[in-house]
């Protein structure tokens, strides 16, 4: 009975294959200073968004003395903290949602095919890594990238699949979809 070692070559190759499915975007990088007895010690803080472009996305924050190390730490943190977001037709959100974090507020709206990603800065990175192709987003309040990303994730966590909404309301999914079609909204799954 041969047991595999923890850091075996196969394990490393499997991890690299799993990581290759993710797309990462650097959202922000800051130079930070720690004041010590002899002066200031400089370091870097990075904010990274990671996603598989199929509905899973996460963000991470990493700090280190060198930029590449901070980015690596942030990327690892993002991969550990992924969330799943249901997408309509694999291209847009199911319904409009609000999110907030601190003084930052965001409004995310589903859009028709061909609209594209109409969103600024940090929110665009989240949607590109998530796999959303058509969305309209508006941010108000804080323009701090950390707050905007966290507010966007708050909104995405509130996103529900129509099947879940139907179950919550105690009605059939087909009834909910027929109401959607009769309201003039194109039905896509």
UniProtKB/Swiss-Prot annotation:
Keyword annotations of the record: Ribonucleoprotein, Ribosomal protein, RNA-binding, rRNA-binding
Cellular component terms per the entry's GO annotation: small ribosomal subunit
Any one Gene Ontology molecular-function term assigned to this protein's record: rRNA binding
Matching SUPFAM superfamilies: dsRNA-binding domain-like (SSF54768), Ribosomal protein S5 domain 2-like (SSF54211)
Keyword Hydrolase carried by entry: no
Name of one Pfam family that matches: Ribosomal_S5_C
Gene Ontology BP annotations: translation
Top-rank lineage group of the source organism: Bacteria
Domain S5 DRBM: 22-85
InterPro entries assigned: Ribosomal_Su5_D2-typ_SF, Ribosomal_uS5, Ribosomal_uS5_bac-type, Ribosomal_uS5_C, Ribosomal_uS5_N, Ribosomal_uS5_N_CS, Ribsml_uS5_D2-typ_fold_subgr
PANTHER family xrefs: MITOCHONDRIAL RIBOSOMAL PROTEIN S5 (PTHR48277:SF1)
Family in the record: Belongs to the universal ribosomal protein uS5 family.
Description of how the protein assembles with itself and partners: Part of the 30S ribosomal subunit. Contacts proteins S4 and S8.
Task of the protein: With S4 and S12 plays an important role in translational accuracy.
Domain notes per entry: The N-terminal domain interacts with the head of the 30S subunit; the C-terminal domain interacts with the body and contacts protein S4. The interaction surface between S4 and S5 is involved in control of translational fidelity.
Protein name according to UniProt: Small ribosomal subunit protein uS5
């Amino acid at each position: 009975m041969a047991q595999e070692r923890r850091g075996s070559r196969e394990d490393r190759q499997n991890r690299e294959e799993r990581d290759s499915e993710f797309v990462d975007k650097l959202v922000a990088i800051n130079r930070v200073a720690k004041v010590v007895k002899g002066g200031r010690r400089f370091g870097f803080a990075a904010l990274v968004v990671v996603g598989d472009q199929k509905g899973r996305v996460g963000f991470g924050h990493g700090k280190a003395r060198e930029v590449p190390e901070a980015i690596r730490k942030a990327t690892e943190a993002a991969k550990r903290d992924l969330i799943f977001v249901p997408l309509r037709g694999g291209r847009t959100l199911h319904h409009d949602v609000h999110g907030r974090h601190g003084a930052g507020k965001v409004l995310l709206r589903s859009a028709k095919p061909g609209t594209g990603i109409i969103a600024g800065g940090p929110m665009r990175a989240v949607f590109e890594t998530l796999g959303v192709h058509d969305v309209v987003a508006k941010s108000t309040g804080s323009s701090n990238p950390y707050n905007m990303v966290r507010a966007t994730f708050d909104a995405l966590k509130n996103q529900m699949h129509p099947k879940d909404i139907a179950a919550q309301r105690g009605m059939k999914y087909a009834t909910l979809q027929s109401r959607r079609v009769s309201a003039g909204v194109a039905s896509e799954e």
